[in-house]
């Protein structure tokens, strides 16, 4: 089923994007705190 493959890869892609967004938020917050401390 090409459908199933598409849906699976798409959901995996969505998960990756969510993880990247989360990491960007965490790293951004940490970076801002470090800058404020200097």
Swiss-Prot record:
Location of the protein in the cell: Secreted
Modified residues annotated as Lysine amide in this record: 38
Principal location: secreted
The entry's keywords: Amidation, Hormone, Secreted
GO biological process: adenylate cyclase-activating G protein-coupled receptor signaling pathway; neuron projection development; neuropeptide signaling pathway; positive regulation of ERK1 and ERK2 cascade; regulation of protein localization
Protein family membership: Belongs to the glucagon family.
Function: PACAP plays pivotal roles as a neurotransmitter and/or a neuromodulator.
Protein name: Pituitary adenylate cyclase-activating polypeptide
Species annotation: Uranoscopus japonicus
């Amino acid at each position: 089923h090409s459908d199933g493959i598409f849906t699976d890869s798409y959901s995996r892609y969505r998960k990756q994007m969510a993880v990247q967004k989360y990491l960007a938020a965490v790293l951004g917050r940490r970076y801002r705190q470090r800058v404020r401390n200097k």
